[in-house]
């Protein structure tokens, strides 16, 4: 079923639990707003509302297409190349949000 969502959805990578910090912001002494996790390599980085937009930079630099929120109270995923927002479908799967 997930193949129909987009060709990038199933990454074949089992992401570890996300970290509680943006790994790149910590290196440069900056701050972040929300955190995202790459579903292709597991790196935890900051969102586009953060000053440095590290997750989008990561996507552009290495081409990893899928990320998810790393916020503890949220559950969604984003595909960069297809610009698709995925949410849980209520049956243990995923659906494209309208």
Task: Report each predicted region and the residues it spans.
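Canonical RING-type zinc finger of E3 ubiquitin-protein ligases
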Residues: 30-39
């Amino acid at each position: 079923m997930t193949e129909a969502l987009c060709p990038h959805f199933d990454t074949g990578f089992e992401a570890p639990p996300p970290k509680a910090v943006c790994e790149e912001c910590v290196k440069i002494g900056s701050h972040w707003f929300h955190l995202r996790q790459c579903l292709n390599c597991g790196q935890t980085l900051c969102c586009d509302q953060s000053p440095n937009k590290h997750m989008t930079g990561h996507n552009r630099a290495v081409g990893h297409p899928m990320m998810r929120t790393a916020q503890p109270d949220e559950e969604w995923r984003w595909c960069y190349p297809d610009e698709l927002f995925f949410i849980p479908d209520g049956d243990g799967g995923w659906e494209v949000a309208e």
